Swiss-Prot record:
Protein name per Swiss-Prot or TrEMBL: Aspartate--tRNA ligase
Encoding gene per record: aspS
Any one Gene Ontology cellular component term annotated for this protein: cytoplasm
Keyword entries, A-Z: Aminoacyl-tRNA synthetase, ATP-binding, Cytoplasm, Ligase, Nucleotide-binding, Protein biosynthesis
EC number of this enzyme: 6.1.1.12
Matching Gene3D superfamilies: Bira Bifunctional Protein, Domain 2, GAD-like domain, Nucleic acid-binding proteins
Residues binding ATP, per UniProt: R220, D221, E222, Q229, E477, G529, L530, D531, R532
Top EC class for this record: ligase
Source species of the chain: Streptococcus agalactiae serotype V (strain ATCC BAA-611 / 2603 V/R)
Length: 583
């Protein structure tokens, strides 16, 4: 029979109606001769009642054979429950079953199909099709669908054109490692799966499309963590003839619409703007979480003349104050923080406690001469804990930034109901790579340098600033964008600054440089990580929770066993040999 409606949508207005439902058996309970079944589908749970006095013997026998996750079809009449269940949207009604049939049986599942299970991640991914049956997972993907629907509506209304760009592209340097795809037709040659549609979307601007967008899969062969996957989805957009401010306005409007459509929240516009240097110096991060205080404070000038070489000879001395929580941190707890500090390159972690109008701790004896100035500068109050890092500016900022976030989580200082958006602007164009021993693009090599600093492309690269902007939400980089280079000579200068020879630049990016000979318009854009955005909206801490079939931390799929070995014949067709491998 045809299904009448979703089980989770039956309400009191349907009382007296004969309906047919289809779904999975959640729980089965036998009480006083009656059998109660929780029927589950994607919209929720509906209670079924099978009364032996009202159904045939065959229906009763079928009901008695039901087990969890059997797929069934039932028909009956909607009636009012004697005692409502306020925990269910369907809690005022139940279905008095008249007909029942089994559409499929099920083995015992490796974990219960319910929220809050304790199965490990690999088990959940091994049986992902079962994991996705759980209500909280279904809700995550309904939310994701609402987000993409809202984004498409917004951008369509602004006359953006949805264009699909190639999945098989050219491998180019800079950025993460590419996933390579060997070509059978062009032996010895490889495609790359795109890390982003960066160059192709810029070429669409040269084609006169003016406003482009795409919700697109991207691929990066990089080390994984909670907010990264080897394949991920981004909301990609590009525009012509707009300023960076105008692009940011468009993105803010899009996010405001998503927040209204999915969470019912009105966000305040425009978003705050914070210079990159301020973010690093005050928060120790280029993606600052502004839901709590505990800002980094520079004490270099105050401590430079103390008789403590760790402080007096350091490039900088910075500190954070953990307000009114000194009693929460024993020596053992502080030692744990010290180990974290060392992971970020710090040589150690100095600390003080402030109580009864005086400082105490291992370094207190060195600071008595400046205790008053220190107390005033840090606005110390009873039971404050002060943590110091004396090192280079970069190490001090990064270390204290990491400790700031760690401590805020430990002490539950974060208001998780807040959605704090902000722009980080005024970025450096380059960042120094110790591993590479050279400057690399902070974003990518197509970012436009500011007019005031472009001359430093042939000088001090540390002084070059970019017309770039990142959008940050609650301590996560939600997306990044910039105005792009559209002048050939500037692009060639950029490649040279990054260490490309003229021949190498031509080999890697000749098609882009050639396009710049044909009236390339001023343009810019942005990409937002869709998975990360949905993760934050759903209140999760891992993007696997909002990706239907994710990979684990080894970039593997426990369900399909991808990646896998391939046959010798397949390798021969590609003229490839595998020298060695480990199972």
């Amino acid at each position: 029979m045809k299904r009448s409606m979703y089980a989770g949508r039956v309400r009191s207005e349907h009382i007296g109606t004969s309906i047919t439902l289809k779904g999975w058996v959640g729980r089965r309970r036998d009480l006083g001769g009656l059998i109660f079944i929780d029927l589950r589908d994607r919209e929720g749970i509906m209670q079924l009642v099978i009364n032996p006095e009202e159904v045939s013997a065959s229906v009763m026998a079928t009901a008695e054979s039901l087990r969890s996750e059997f797929v069934i079809e039932v028909s009956g009449v909607v009636t009012a429950r004697e005692q409502a269940n306020d925990n269910l949207p369907t809690g005022e009604v139940e279905l008095k079953v008249q007909e029942l049939s089994i559409l499929n049986t099920s083995k015992t599942t490796p974990f219960e199909i319910k929220d809050g299970i304790e199965a490990n991640d690999d088990t959940r991914m091994r049986y992902r099709y079962l994991d996705l049956r759980r209500p909280e997972m279904l809700e995550n993907f309904k939310l994701r669908a609402k987000v993409t629907h809202s984004i498409r509506n917004y951008l369509d209304n602004l006359e953006f054109i949805d264009v699909e760009t190639p999945m098989l592209t050219k491998s180019t340097p800079e950025g993460a490692r590419d996933y390579l795809v060997p070509s059978r037709v062009n032996q010895g040659h490889f495609y790359a799966l795109p890390q982003s549609p960066q160059i192709t979307k810029q070429l669409l601007m040269n084609a006169g499309f003016d406003r482009y967008y795409q919700i697109v899969k991207c691929f990066r062969d990089e080390d994984l963590r909670g907010d990264r996957q080897p394949e991920f989805t981004q909301v990609d957009l590009e525009t012509s003839f707009l300023s960076d401010q105008e692009i940011q306005d468009i993105v803010e409007g899009m996010i405001a619409k998503v927040m209204k459509d999915t969470k019912g929240l009105e966000v305040s516009l425009p978003f705050p703007r914070m210079a990159y240097d301020d973010a690093m110096n005050n928060y120790g991060s280029d993606k600052p979480d502004t839901r709590f205080d505990m800002l980094l404070q520079d004490l270099t000038e105050i401590v430079k003349e103390v008789d403590f070489k760790v402080f007096s000879e350091a490039s900088v001395v910075k500190a954070i104050v953990v307000k009114d929580k000194a009693d929460k941190y024993s020596r053992k707890n502080i030692d744990k923080l010290t180990e974290i500090a060392k992971q970020y390159g710090a040589k150690g972690l100095a600390w003080l406690k402030y109580a009864d109008n005086t400082i105490s701790g291992p370094v207190a004896k060195f600071l008595t001469a400046i205790e008053g100035r220190l107390t005033e500068a840090l606005q110390l109050e009873n039971n404050d804990l002060i943590l110091f890092v004396a090192d280079s500016l970069e190490v001090a900022n990064e270390t204290l930034g990491a400790l700031r976030t760690r401590i805020a989580k430990e002490l539950e200082l974060i208001d998780y109901s807040k959605f704090n958006f902000l722009w980080v602007v005024d970025w450096p164009m380059f960042e120094w790579s110790e591993e590479e021993g050279r400057y690399m693009s902070a974003h990518h090599p197509f970012t436009l340098p500011t007019a005031e600093t472009a001359h430093e492309l042939e000088g001090d690269l540390a002084k070059v600033r970019a017309v770039a902007y990142d959008i940050v939400l609650n301590g996560y980089e939600l997306g990044g964008g910039s105005l792009r280079i559209n002048q050939k000579d500037t692009q060639e200068r950029m490649f040279k600054a990054l260490g490309f020879s003229a021949e190498s630049a031509q080999e890697q990016f000749g098609f882009l440089l050639e396009a710049m000979d044909y009236g390339f318009p001023p343009h810019g854009g942005l990409a937002i990580g869709l998975d990360r955005f949905v993760m934050l909206l759903a209140g999760k801490d891992n993007i696997r929770e909002v990706i239907a079939f994710p990979k684990n931390n080894k970039a593997s799929d426990p369900m399909t066993q991808a990646p896998s070995l391939v046959s010798e014949q397949q390798l021969e067709e590609l003229s490839l040999t595998v020298e060695s491998y480990e199972n």
